[in-house]
Amino acid sequence: LGDVYKRQTLTGLDNIYMQQVKAYGNVDRDPGERVISVTYYALINVTDYANSLLPESDLEWISLDRKRELIFDHEQMLDDAILLLRRHAALHPIGFNLLPEKFTLTQLQSLYESIYGETMDKRNFRKKILGMDILERLDEKDKKSSKRGAYYYVFNRQRYESMLDKGFVFTM
């Protein structure tokens, strides 16, 4: 509980989706003393927490492509967390936790491209995600990006859970 309080105090993160990754306890992982660490990943929208880090904490949000060299086995911890996140994203619709309630297919594709660190073919992505029948297209369009506009969609969690009961498997 102390760690939860410390995390909430330092980062402002509270009531979020967190997944345990792994425990690390090799004898030689820290030259100073024996240390056991448990890692987690959390799904958050950083813009919601941009100002929540305590200034005196020396913490900052950074993009993975701007990360600095990490100490001890922390690089392995990060790699393990990214791998587990990608596995979960491939098998569960966890990405919808990071999107606004209504979103465009471009926003959804951009999210999955960020998770996987690679560009996806637009036509194939749309065919696959729409073929799952877990999205509902709204009559409303986002006209910020183009004159024609892009339809907004919502994730139909109830339909998804009903389909799970019938053996549906979410695969990206």
Regions of interest found by a model, annotated:
Residues 9-52, 66, 86-95, 132-136:
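Active-site segment of metal-dependent pyrophosphate-handling enzymes
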Residues 1-5:
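Short, small-residue-biased leader/transition segments that mark boundaries at the very start
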Residues 91-172:
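Core RNA-modification/binding signature centered on pseudouridine synthases
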Residues 41-42, 50-89, 98-106, 124-133, ...:
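NUDIX/MutT-family hydrolases
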